[in-house]
A protein has these predicted regions:
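Feature of Fe-S/electron-transfer and energy-metabolism proteins
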Residues: 1-587
Length: 587
């Protein structure tokens, strides 16, 4: 850690494992055998454990990945925007095929899930710098420049924030001018209990999707006797179709930092960590610069913000490409330099979190909202939204619409209103809260978005992702993409998720090929129920959500995908076709 943190508290050496792996990956293009022994000795762990950590993360490679490592996004939004054309062009121009390097070792081509640029698809990362709105001519130009010796950094794009809508009448919560120290100055006259009461009054709930009351989490950490305590920002925004936190970090880093400082002051923590997803390497410098500015103004470090006796510091920890690390206990394991496998829930992180010490984990939007609420006051905040869901929410809109981007809506806006704002093109199927969320049909356009979660209520929660698909999109193709994503991202530690995602994927393949029957549909639902009830973490519990909901809402569509001639026997196998090559070439 930096400055005061180093002096007062030393983190165990292994917490630096991911940082060291990143250094090796970036300098060498891969992690070779000698590095394994070196790391095992440095961190006093076995070589097998080091190998286990490396193999868990998507961006750590044991084989060379080329001078220019290209990760092309293969999410469903990229797919409908021209992914296949870009994939073919990259292979043709580089001379490599995906999953390998070209013969000269210049280019390495790899696929990766959503990289947080759904409003700029198709997109890719080259040496972890963003390249957006790709087309065939742009790809040719990029590869030519790289072949001529240009660095990826020198020719990369600067993704626009695309803030399309904020509440009229200057009622935006997130995007008002915010000078460093705006909120910290208020802490001089505030007490931790006063902060808790203000957040309770505002009804702020976690914006990662679970909507747990923020004041309850902070209060639980505040009363813990163990020291030191930690504040962790979950900036591992990995849900496909979500990019709101990217925009906040790029545009409102001050709000994020002050939200973390407020939390530290409230719970009695001195140490903050931003866990930034590997796909957002290009944002790290901006966050580093913001942290330096706060240090230079006395707003971080000893006697933070001129508050005697209050010290707080922040460091950034890079993730390395693992969706499951968005789950809070998996994130904690990753912070400790281990495989990002979810913990069994004997304790909440506020009781035993990072290094088994009290830890508050909130996402970027939650910390920013907390800062803004303390700045404007709960009374003003409560004037926005609807009863039971006060305030505003950031929605990442992408897909078949003319204006993809960020929409800051007041809670209570209907699906129809949002579709109108983004100029949706003949919407038919809408995916809310990403693949792990809920799909809705255009017939449900009158539903409101809110935080209300009651049985039978018509409102819909939205964690942040809002993907729009028109009538020309194949629903099954969308769901297969989601299923492949979950199968790939499952950490594999629990059987229901590991086996369930694989089996569901096979069932969808049968459905896609016209071999499925009603029994297959029933078995998909059964496996979805098993996963929901018995998986270890939220990934497995929600992986089949959209598929099962879609099977109910679009039942007639799924009927058209079944084998109409199925009579209880599998008569599709063609022995003559299967042995054709043997008969032709046998000696």
């Amino acid at each position: 850690m930096t400055n005061g943190i180093e002096k007062k508290f030393k983190e165990p050496d292994q917490t630096q494992m991911l940082n060291r792996l990143w250094e090796l990956q970036k300098s060498n293009g891969y992690i070779h055998d000698d590095n394994i022994k070196e790391l095992a000795n440095a961190f006093n762990v076995s070589e097998v454990e080091v190998e286990g950590v490396i193999s868990f993360y998507h961006f750590f490679q044991r084989n060379p990945t080329g001078k220019y490592t290209i990760y092309l996004n293969n999410s469903i939004i990229a797919d409908i925007k021209g992914f296949e054309r870009i994939k073919e062009t990259l292979e043709r121009e580089t001379g490599a095929t995906f999953g390998t390097n070209d013969r000269t070792g210049t280019f390495g081509l790899f696929l990766t899930p959503c990289i947080g640029l759904s409003d700029h698809e198709p997109s890719a990362l080259i040496n972890f710098y963003p390249f957006i709105n790709l087309n065939t001519s742009k790809v040719k130009d990029i590869i030519t420049k790289l072949k001529n010796g240009a660095s990826a950094e020198s020719i990369c794009d600067a993704p626009a924030d695309n803030i399309r809508y904020t509440p009229p009448g200057n009622k935006t919560v997130f995007f008002k001018k915010f000078a460093p120290g705006s909120v910290i100055s208020k802490l001089v006259q505030a007490t931790p209990l006063g902060i808790i009461e203000e957040l309770k009054k505002s009804e702020l709930a976690g914006r990662g999707g679970a909507y747990f009351p923020t004041w309850k989490k902070w209060n639980s950490a505040m009363v813990q006797p163990a020291l030191p305590k930690f504040v962790v920002c979950n900036a591992d925004e990995g849900e496909p179709g979500t990019f709101k936190d990217r925009v906040l970090m790029n545009r409102e880093a001050n709000s994020l930092i002050e939200g973390m400082i407020i939390c530290g002051y409230t719970i009695g923590a001195e140490y903050g960590i931003i866990y930034l997803r590997g796909e957002y390497w290009w944002l790290k410098n901006k966050l580093d610069e913001a942290i330096k500015e706060y240090h230079s103004k006395g707003l971080l470090g000893e006697d933070c913000g001129n508050i005697k006796g209050f010290s707080f510091d922040i460091r950034i920890q890079m993730g390395a490409g693992s969706y499951v690390c968005g789950e809070e206990t998996a994130l904690l394991e990753s912070l400790e330099g281990k495989r990002g496998e979810p913990r069994t829930k004997w304790f909440f992180p506020v009781e035993k979190g990072y290094l088994q010490l009290p830890t508050v984990i909130n996402n970027v939007e939650t910390f920013c909202a907390a800062a803004k609420i303390i700045e404007m006051g709960a009374e003003e905040y409560l004037k926005l939204g609807i009863p039971g869901s006060p305030g505003t929410k950031l929605i990442s809109v992408s897909g078949d619409c003319q204006l993809p981007g960020i929409y800051e809506i007041e809670w209570g806006m209907t699906i129809e209103e949002l579709l109108g704002l983004c100029k949706a093109d003949d919407p038919y199927y809408i995916q809310v809260s990403g693949p792990s969320g809920e799909c809705i049909s255009i017939n449900e356009k009158s539903r409101r978005m809110s935080m209300i979660d009651l049985p039978g209520q018509k409102d819909i929660r939205c964690g942040g992702s809002f993907m729009i698909f028109n009538k020309h999109r194949d629903i099954l193709k969308i769901l297969v993409n989601f299923s492949e994503f979950f199968k790939h991202e499952s950490c594999g530690i629990c059987t229901p998720c590991r086996a369930g995602n694989f089996i569901i994927q096979r069932k969808l393949d049968r459905l896609n090929n016209g071999f499925a029957n009603e029994t297959d549909l029933d078995e998909i639902k059964s496996w979805g129920t098993i996963m929901k009830n018995t998986s270890r973490c939220g990934l497995g519990k929600t992986a089949a959500n959209s598929l099962i909901i879609a099977m109910d809402k679009f039942h007639d569509y799924f009927k058209t995908k079944l084998d109409k001639n199925y009579d209880g026997l599998n008569l599709k196998f063609d022995m003559d076709a299967a042995t054709k090559d043997y008969e032709e070439y046998k000696i």
